């Protein structure tokens, strides 16, 4: 347990905070604090004036000495127990298709391949009618407490419930843990993970000054610099302004070092191979680690493709965001990591990135899903995209009957993502012995409001006709780790 005391947020609110680190500077000591029940992106260095000593301070409790293990519990398992364990392991390792009773490759028509792993579960009938909320009675069907879809950041939920969930994680399997994280928006798989102190104070990238959110393994000497200069084209980093300006006079790169595969009047997409452009991709991963707490890969970039979205002007193509994708994903993921840079957030770029990843899946003829766990902001972005995409299809005139499988084929989403989105929106109901998709009044109203808003502001969408891209084919050596 760390030292707990009350500190003032930047808006003046008093919150309980953990002191993670202390450093001594010329102007006095400063404290690196994590605000309890808040996301780690709000961690910051504060001076002593923002600490409130009028409240009781919670001191760390001394660790209890470990009990010595006796020899009683170290007996070898009996032969019968070993036989039972072997039998259980044989049962578990059986072929999944045989366990579920599915008949594989027997007279099936060709269709886009699905994502692997747990992304495809058969949970609903093949075809379901679409009806309005007034057409059926909801007796016997559990209602949501509110028609609104609550997207709750896990960091703002009750602290007690979080601790109970964390204790329960110890009893979960890895697959169950991943499942919990992808639906909760947690930033890390390990709840006991030690906080990494944010090592950079401020970035200058192009015309923007940016405050980092998390730790990133830049050189240790950078932690003492007041500002870090990052070239917005080649992503090289400097802690000295003179060195940065000298670099800018020599650097000739004006766009990501890859093939431009999409261009419209607003944005461009570049495909960058991590094996061919290792330095640039590593610099990109270092930069994104400042804003993605769950990101662990920043050195071995060979097995990944990076799809970078840029805006254009007379000086060049300015990086807005990107997503990475494994060259050969065993689980069938169509996206490994996604980021919109903070200076471009809340402008609709995240939706364009997600939409573009599904356009690539459609071109490949596959069903895709993002890699788990999703960050809190990533989960919100995907849920919004899934909701809007499915409602658009269901609202098409003349569409009276549709199945989850058909929705997946139309959108390149996995059936699991389709099913979960319908459940979150409270659109699945059991009616007269069948499951039906219900377009609730709230969903229809929100869809109309979004269309009106798009007419006023103008919605930007990916135009599939402008995508000049074929699914790349890689050799075994080019899609493996560079070990």
Curated annotation (Swiss-Prot):
UniProt cross-references to Gene3D superfamilies, sorted A to Z: 2.30.30.140, 3.40.630.30, N-acetyl transferase-like, Winged helix-like DNA-binding domain superfamily/Winged helix DNA-binding domain
- Per its UniProt record, what InterPro entries does this chain match? Acyl_CoA_acyltransferase, Chromo-like_dom_sf, Chromo/chromo_shadow_dom, HAT_MYST-type, MYST_HAT, Tudor-knot, WH-like_DNA-bd_sf, Zf-MYST
Domain Tudor-knot: from-to ranges: 10-53
Any single GO molecular-function term of the entry would be:
chromatin binding
The segments annotated as C2HC MYST-type zinc fingers are: 228-253
- Top EC class for this record: transferase
Q: Which domain of life is it from?
A: Eukaryota
Which residues carry the post-translational modification N6-acetyllysine, per the record?
295
**Modified after translation how?**
Autoacetylation at Lys-295 is required for proper function.
- A single Pfam family it belongs to is Tudor-knot
Q: Name one GO cellular component term.
A: chromatin
Work out whether the entry's keyword set contains DNA damage. yes
Q: Where is this motif: ESA1-RPD3 motif?
A: 278-299
Biased-composition ranges, Basic and acidic residues, are: 57-69
Q: Where in the cell is it found?
A: Nucleus; Chromosome
Residues noted as binding acetyl-CoA in the record, renumbered to the chain: 336-340, 345-351, 375
Task: Assign the protein's first listed, main location to one coarse class.
Answer: nucleus
Provide the GO biological process annotations: DNA repair; DNA repair-dependent chromatin remodeling; positive regulation of heterochromatin formation; regulation of transcription by RNA polymerase II
* Active site residues according to the UniProt entry: 371 (proton donor/acceptor)
Residues marked Important for catalytic activity (site): 337
The entry's function note states:
Catalytic component of the NuA4 histone acetyltransferase (HAT) complex which is involved in epigenetic transcriptional activation of selected genes principally by acetylation of nucleosomal histones H4, H3, H2B, H2A and H2A variant H2A.Z. Acetylates histone H4 to form H4K5ac, H4K8ac, H4K12ac and H4K16ac, histone H3 to form H3K14ac, and histone H2A to form H2AK4ac and H2AK7ac. The NuA4 complex is involved in the DNA damage response and is required for chromosome segregation. The NuA4 complex plays a direct role in repair of DNA double-strand breaks (DSBs) through homologous recombination.
PANTHER family under this entry?
Answer: HISTONE ACETYLTRANSFERASE, HISTONE ACETYLTRANSFERASE ESA1
Family assignment from sequence similarity: Belongs to the MYST (SAS/MOZ) family.
Q: How does it assemble?
A: Component of the NuA4 histone acetyltransferase complex.
Domain annotation text?
The ESA1-RPD3 motif is common to ESA1 and RPD3 and is required for ESA1 histone acetyl-transferase (HAT) activity and RPD3 histone deacetylase (HDAC) activity.
Q: What is the official name of this protein in its record?
A: Histone acetyltransferase esa1
Q: Which organism is it from?
A: Aspergillus fumigatus (strain ATCC MYA-4609 / CBS 101355 / FGSC A1100 / Af293) (Neosartorya fumigata)
Q: What is the lineage of its organism?
A: Eukaryota, Fungi, Dikarya, Ascomycota, Pezizomycotina
């Amino acid at each position: 347990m760390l030292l707990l005391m009350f500190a003032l947020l930047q808006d003046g609110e008093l919150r309980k905070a953990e002191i993670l680190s202390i450093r001594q500077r010329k102007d006095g000591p400063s404290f690196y604090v994590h605000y309890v029940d808040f996301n780690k992106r709000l961690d910051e260095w504060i001076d002593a004036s923002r600490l409130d000593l009028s409240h009781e301070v919670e001191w760390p409790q001394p660790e209890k000495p470990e009990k010595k293990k006796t020899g009683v519990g170290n007996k070898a398992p009996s032969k019968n127990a070993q036989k039972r364990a072997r039998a259980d392991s044989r049962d578990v390792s059986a072929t999944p298709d045989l366990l579920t009773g599915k008949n594989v490759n027997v007279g099936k028509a060709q269709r886009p391949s699905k994502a692997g792993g747990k992304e495809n579960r058969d949970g609903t009938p093949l075809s379901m009618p679409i009806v309005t909320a007034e057409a059926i009675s909801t007796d016997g069907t559990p209602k949501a407490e509110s028609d609104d879809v609550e997207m709750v950041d896990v960091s703002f939920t009750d602290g007690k419930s979080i601790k109970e969930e964390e204790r329960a994680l110890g009893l979960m399997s890895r697959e169950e843990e991943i499942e919990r994280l992808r639906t909760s928006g947690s930033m890390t798989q390990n709840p006991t993970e030690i906080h990494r102190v944010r090592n950079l104070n401020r970035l200058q990238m192009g015309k923007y000054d940016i405050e980092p959110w998390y730790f990133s393994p830049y050189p240790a000497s950078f932690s003492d610099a007041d500002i870090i200069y990052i070239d917005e084209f080649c992503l090289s980093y400097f802690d000295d302004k003179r060195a940065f300006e000298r670099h800018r006079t020599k650097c000739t790169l004006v766009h990501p070092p890859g093939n431009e595969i999409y261009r419209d009047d607003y944005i461009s997409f570049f495909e960058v191979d991590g094996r061919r452009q290792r330095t640039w991709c590593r610099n990109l991963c270092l930069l994104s680690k400042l804003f993605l707490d769950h990101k662990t890969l920043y050195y071995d970039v060979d097995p990944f493709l990076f799809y970078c979205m840029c805006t254009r002007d007379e000086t060049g193509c300015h990086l807005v965001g990107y997503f990475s994708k494994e060259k050969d994903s065993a689980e069938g993921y169509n996206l490994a990591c996604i980021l919109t840079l903070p200076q471009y957030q809340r402008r609709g770029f995240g939706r364009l990135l997600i939409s573009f990843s599904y356009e690539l899946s459609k071109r490949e003829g596959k069903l895709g899903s993002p890699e788990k766990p999703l960050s809190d902001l990533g989960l919100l972005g995907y849920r919004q995209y899934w909701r809007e995409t499915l409602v658009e299809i269901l609202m098409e005139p003349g569409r009276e009957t549709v199945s989850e499988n058909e929705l997946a084929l139309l959108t390149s989403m996995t059936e699991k993502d389709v099913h979960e989105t319908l459940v979150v929106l409270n659109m699945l109901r059991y009616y007269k012995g069948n499951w039906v998709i219900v377009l609730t009044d709230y969903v229809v109203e929100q869809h109309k409001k979004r269309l009106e808003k798009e007419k006023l502001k103008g919605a930007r969408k990916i135009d599939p006709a402008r995508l000049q891209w074929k699914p790349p084919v890689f050799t075994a050596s080019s899609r493996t780790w560079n070990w």
